[in-house]
Amino acid sequence: MLRVGPLTIGTLDDWAPSTGSTVSWRPSAVAHTKASQAPISDVPVSYMQAQHIRGYCEQKAKGLDYSRLMVVSCQQPGQCDIRAANYVINAHLRRHDTYRSWFQYNGNGQIIRRTIQDPADIEFVPVHHGELTLPQIREIVQNTPDPLQWGCFRFGIVQGCDHFTFFASVDHVHVDAMIVGVTLMEFHLMYAALVGGHAPLELPPAGSYDDFCRRQHTFSSTLTVESPQVRAWTKFAEGTNGSFPDFPLPLGDPSKPSDADIVTVMMLDEEQTAQFESVCTAAGARFIGGVLACCGLAEHELTGTTTYYGLTPRDTRRTPADAMTQGWFTGLIPITVPIAGSAFGDAARAAQTSFDSGVKLAEVPYDRVVELSSTLTMPRPNFPVVNFLDAGAAPLSVLLTAELTGTNIGVYSDGRYSYQLSIYVIRVEQGTAVAVMFPDNPIARESVARYLATLKSVFQRVAESGQQQNVA
C-alpha cells in the first residue's frame, strides 16, 4: 500500500473503511429489463474497450482471473443522507453516456455494443445491508459484475460513527484513471450542495464517450503501414521481439492463477526530489524524462541491455468537455532510450525527446498497428507500464485540491492480477515513491524487490551527485 498525503493507493485488501451500516446501489429491476432490451448500437467499440473485453474473456477461458475493477473511495462527515446520495449517484449515471452501453462477445472475437436510448431509463436503487464486517463489505465491491453485463458498476456508502465512506467500483471498460477526479469530485460537490440545502449543482456539460469512439474509429481507419505513427510503433515493437517489452527479471509462470500484490519503496525524500529535478533540468529534461532514464539505467544494471524500451500511459482528452467525461481515453507512449555508455544527462535528454515526440502515438492503439502488420504480435504477459503521477498534474492534482482536503481518498485495484505489470512513480511534496503491482508469487516478489532496490540506487546516485555523471 502507498500513502501520499490524503491519497492511498493499493489493492482491495488494503481498503479499510470504518465498518458499520452499509448501503449499496444497484440497477432496479425495471432498469435491468430496459438494458436487456437495448438495441445494437452503431457506435464502434473503442480499441481500449475491445482489448479489455478480449483480455477478460481469453484469460477466463484459460481458467485465469483478470484485474478489471477500478475502485475509488472518499470520506464525508456526518450521517449519510441516503436520499441525497441516491440523487447524486443516478445523476452521475445519467450524465455520462458510457454507462448506457453493455457488450456481447462471440467466439470469433467480434464485440457487439448495445446501448440504452433514454438515459432516464437508468435507475440505481439503494440496498440496505445492515451492519457488515470488513470482508463482507469488500465482497460487495469484488462482486461488481463483469464487463459483459450492463451494470458492471456499483456504488455504496459505509456509515461510521462521525463520518461515512463513499465508494465506487467500476469495470475498467467504462473508466480510466480520471475516475478519481470525475467520480469523486462530482459526488463530493453535488452531495455537499444538496445536504447544504441548496438546489442540485449545475455541472459543466460532460462530453460524449460515444463521440470519442467514433473519432478514434474514423482516425484509425485512415492508418496504413506507411503512416508515420504506425512506422514508429512498428520500429519500437521490432526492438522488443515484435511486441511490447518484457520486465527485466522473471515473474513466475503466467499460465498459473495469481492474485496481485503491491510493494512500495520511497525513492527520494523531499530534499533529494528537489535535487533530482535540478539535475534533470540541467540536463535539458523534465522530471518524467529523468524518471524514464532511471528506469532504463536500472534495467542496464540488471541485464546489461544497451537500449531501454518502455511504455508510459497518456490521457488523450483534449477539450474541456473531454476532461469532464467518464470513459477510457488513455493510450500508451512508446519510449526508446539508448543506455549503453550513457551518462544520466544523455539518457534523460533522450528519454525526454522520446516522450515528447511520442505523445501523439498515444492516440494510435497498438492493437490497430498489429492489425496492419504481418510481423507484430499482441503483448506478452507481464509487460511493464510506468505510470508517473505528479501532485501538480491531473489526475493527482484534482485530488489534492482544497475541496477534497480531509476526505481520505483511496484508489484500489480489485486484487486480481491480469496481464500488465504496473509501476507507479508518484511525486508529491514530501518526496518520490515507486510502487509496483505484480503477480503474487515467490519468484515475482524476489524480482520486484531486486528491481526496486536497483532503481532506488540509481535515483539516489543521480540526486546526490548533483551532476550528470554516468550512474550506470
UniProtKB/Swiss-Prot annotation:
InterPro entries: CAT-like_dom_sf, Condensatn. Disruption phenotype: Deletion of the gene prevents PAT synthesis. Its EC number is 2.3.1.278, 2.3.1.279. Keywords: Acyltransferase, Transferase. It catalyses: a long-chain fatty acyl-CoA + alpha,alpha-trehalose = a 2-O-(long-chain fatty acyl)-alpha,alpha-trehalose + CoA; a mycolipenoyl-CoA + a 2-O-(long-chain fatty acyl)-alpha,alpha-trehalose = a 2-O-(long-chain fatty acyl)-3-O-mycolipenoyl-trehalose + CoA; alpha,alpha-trehalose + hexadecanoyl-CoA = 2-O-hexadecanoyl-alpha,alpha-trehalose + CoA; 2-O-hexadecanoyl-alpha,alpha-trehalose + hexadecanoyl-CoA = 2-O,3-O-dihexadecanoyl-alpha,alpha-trehalose + CoA. It comes from the Bacteria. GO terms for molecular function: palmitoyltransferase activity. Disulfide bonds: none annotated. GO terms for cellular component: membrane. GO terms for biological process: glycolipid biosynthetic process; trehalose metabolic process. Belongs to the PapA acyltransferase family. Involved in the biosynthesis of polyacyltrehalose (PAT), a pentaacylated, trehalose-based glycolipid that could have a role in anchoring the bacterial capsule. Catalyzes the sequential transfer of two palmitoyl groups onto a single glucose residue of trehalose generating the diacylated product 2,3-diacyltrehalose (trehalose dipalmitate). Although palmitoyl-CoA (PCoA) seems to be the physiological acyl donor, PapA3 can also use docosanoyl (22-carbon saturated fatty acid) coenzyme A as acyl donor. This is Acyltransferase PapA3. It comes from Mycobacterium tuberculosis (strain ATCC 25618 / H37Rv).
